[in-house]
């Protein structure tokens, strides 16, 4: 670690001892926490399932977006054991609209391992829990803290923002992982480690917000160097939005059907039902296809520029299967449904 990194850690370490971060933030949490459907009592039999499901759903998705999907999912599948016995097609249907469907597949695979190989018990170490599909450092630490009350911090954007503002240093100048690892016992001064995991994330979401933080009601305002700073420096690293351009080719027929395939490698929609998608092709080079429209589709931090083409055909390539534009029983990602709505205008 460089000298600057060491200096930052010393500053924060001194500050932590000065006002006991964990107890102070848990006290705030007790009075201000949101009533979220996955927040069940610590000894509830639903705890493992609800925490596992919510952590997967919350990956790259905001709380307010997740809530209705979580309620719908748990209404259909009430236990982890039932989840492990549900087929992938049905899981994807219940997940439909939430996006990033790889999460749903990982959740299903993880549930099978926990039920069949782990005797319905979640692994208790980070190294073991990370062997489960779809679980990395962040989700692993969150689950160990939430399920087992272990002294853990899930280092999401909310938590990093709080720490960086307390010392008024840019996030990329702080080695958060090393700091938490080396000073874990001093960071956690409460027996309520599970609540601390949620409290610090909740505080970052409701008070120490990315834009327009509520500094005047902040419980740390007496100690926060960001609050005392006249410059109010921008401490977080900007999100890099990637831009991609695609040409999408849709086989359709007179029965209001479209040819789709799940044999694709489109990252965020890998193995989902989609038309033929290719890296953008110059319009002048495309023959025997009708151009329908150009549009943009934003997914998380991606902006997709899409040229949409179609042709009426009785036959389709072997990799494709016919799907009705109006069938609501099949799992169809929102990305594809937006294509459906544009094609409906042709009938």
Residues of each region from the PLM?
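Catalytic cores of DNA base-excision repair glycosylases
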Residues: 13-22, 28, 32-214, 220-223, ...
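Generic detector of intrinsically disordered, low-complexity, polar/charged segments
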Residues: 1-2, 94-96, 131-133, 154, ...
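Intrinsically disordered, low-complexity, charged terminal extensions of DNA damage-control enzymes
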Residues: 3-40, 44, 205-347
